[in-house]
Every structure is written in C-alpha cells, then in structure tokens.
Amino acid sequence: SSTTHRLTENGVDVTGLHTDRSPTSLAVVSVSPDGERSFRFMRGADANLSPDEIDEGWVDRSKVLHFGSVSLTAGMSRSATIFAARRAHKTGKLVSYDPNYRPSLWRGREEAMQWLQIPLPLAGMVKMSREELPLLTGSEDLERGSEILEDMGIQLVVVTLGAQGAFYRWRGRTGQVPGKEIEAADTNGAGDTFLGALLYR
C-alpha cells in the first residue's frame, strides 16, 4: 500500500506488519481553553490483532517490546498483547509498558484496574502519570507506589509529574528530574515523546 511504501521510504521497518479491512482507529482529542484534554475513541483495525498474527521470531529478534494499554481494551488485541509480552519476557527482552488510562475505553474503573495490572509482572520498565499510580498500586505516594512496582520485578519505574518533571525508581534508588519551564500550547503526545526518548537512551 502507499502507506507501507511511505513508511519504508522513511526508514520504518514494517516487518511483521498485518493489514485489516477495518478502518484505522481514531482518537479525537479536544483541548479546553484551560488546557484540559478530553478523548473520544473510535476503535478499528488494531483491535482485531490476534495472537496468531504475532511472529515469535520477530519478538525474539527485537531488543525492546513496548506496548500501551489501549490494546488491552479489546479482547482480541488484549490476547495478542499479553502473548507478545510473555514471549518477550521469557526470552529476556526489555518489556516496556505505558498503562495510558483512558476512562472512555473501559466499562468502569474496576475493569480498568484489573486489566492494567495484569502485564506488570512481565515489564522491566513502566512509565505512568501521577494519576495512574494508584490505579496500578493502590497508593498515591510516589515512594510507596514505586516500591510496590519494584517488588513485582520492574527495574525502572517512571512517574511523569507534568511541570514538576518526573520521579523515578531504578534498582532501589529514587530521584526526581525537574521539568523545564515552557509555555505549553498542547501537551498531546508529550508522554509518548518522553517515553520514546527514554527508550532510545
């Protein structure tokens, strides 16, 4: 397809790519005058990814497997995501997880908490927002919440704090990296950019 060709031209490896006749999923983000965001999702092709479409050899050849929680909101893609994460964990790859909680994708908070917590023992690195920490650990305290996650075997826990920067726990040590003062017009994609840069380092 033209999209696949464009990706390849720009250096994106499309090995393991599967196509589906369903439309592409859409996320519509509205930003209020005070900067608050609201999300509306229309799920499509990605929700149909099945475990059969996960190439174990592709997982085995990778260095990092990263996933977010949107794929955990639909039964088929949930199975595929957990299958891939288990395979990567078993073969010693770095499993990176972003439990990006979007209430409108779940039937309720209890369901979200159940499924958001399942991948945690498979992850070597987890990045979340301050609001997501209690969903995963039951604790709002950065030190205690990150310790709970470390006890599950997670080596690096990162909690983003908006303008205050980021808190981290790395192999028993904790710290905070301050944010830089800027005039933010739109923070969409900020967490993804932060995590991409962190994984690259």
Model-inferred region functions:
Residues 86-90, 138-201:
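Conserved phosphate-binding/catalytic region of the ribokinase-like
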Residues 1-69:
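Conserved N-terminal subdomain of the carbohydrate kinase-like
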Residues 5-9, 32-35, 112-116, 144-146, ...:
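Short, hinge-like loop/turn segments at secondary-structure boundaries
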Residues 35, 99-101, 130, 161, ...:
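Generic detector of well-ordered alpha-helical packing
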Residues 54-55, 116, 145, 184:
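Acidic, amphipathic alpha-helical patches
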Residues 70-148, 164-166:
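Conserved beta-alpha-beta core of the PfkB/ribokinase-like small-molecule kinase fold
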